[in-house]
From Swiss-Prot:
DNA-binding region: 43-62
Full protein name: HTH-type transcriptional regulator AldR
Protein source organism: Mycolicibacterium smegmatis (strain ATCC 700084 / mc(2)155) (Mycobacterium smegmatis)
PANTHER family (UniProt xref): LEUCINE-RESPONSIVE REGULATORY PROTEIN, POSSIBLE TRANSCRIPTIONAL REGULATORY PROTEIN (PROBABLY LRP_ASNC-FAMILY)
CDD domains: HTH_ARSR
Domain of life: Bacteria
Length: 171
């Protein structure tokens, strides 16, 4: 999470400015689409692709980072390739008296090596956890030791992931 933003994603003082879609022009959008497809594209190739000078392209990418549009560049690791062949989405509901412990739950659960993503929700469930495990026993152990054993957790529901496909750019 970027410096200056809270765990819930609410902007706080010192966080990147509030960027509106209208602040992005066609060139910014083309840069973002190209980086979404290949975040490792060399700046010179990116500049050529969008039709601007490399120095201009570099400045625009830096600006998009500074204002918080580009949050980072990540390595997409295949969990199965590193021995974590089973993935699941786990819906988690906290006890109604545990609402004040949401931040501590998030901070704790993010430290678990099986947790790939944490989604804080509105609706019937409080969270969805995207987890990776070696096998069903490893997944069961994660749920029992990290969720069922937590007195603040009211319930969980686990759905196995058969295939994970990356979605389109949000543009």
């Amino acid at each position: 999470m970027s410096e200056g933003s809270s765990i819930t994603g609410v902007q706080t003082p010192g966080s990147p400015k509030d960027v509106r879609a209208r602040d992005l022009d066609d060139i910014d959008r083309r840069i973002l689409l190209a980086l979404h497809d290949d975040a490792r594209i060399p700046n010179s190739a990116l500049a050529e692709m969008v039709g601007i000078a490399p120095s201009t392209c570099h400045g625009r990418v830096r600006r998009l980072q500074e204002i918080g549009v580009i949050r980072g560049f990540y390595t997409d690791i295949d969990p199965a390739a590193v021995g974590l062949g089973l993935q699941a989405m786990i819906s988690v509901s906290l006890q109604s008296n545990a609402r004040g412990k949401i931040r501590s739950f998030i901070a704790h659960i993010r430290t678990r090596p099986q947790v790939m993503d944490v989604y804080f929700l509105a609706g019937g469930d409080d969270f969805i956890l995207h987890v990776a495990a070696r096998d069903t026993e490893d997944l069961r152990k994660f749920v029992v030791e990290n969720l069922n054993a937590d007195s603040d957790v009211a319930g969980t529901q686990t759905s196995l992931i058969f295939e994970h496909l990356r979605g389109a750019s949000p543009l």
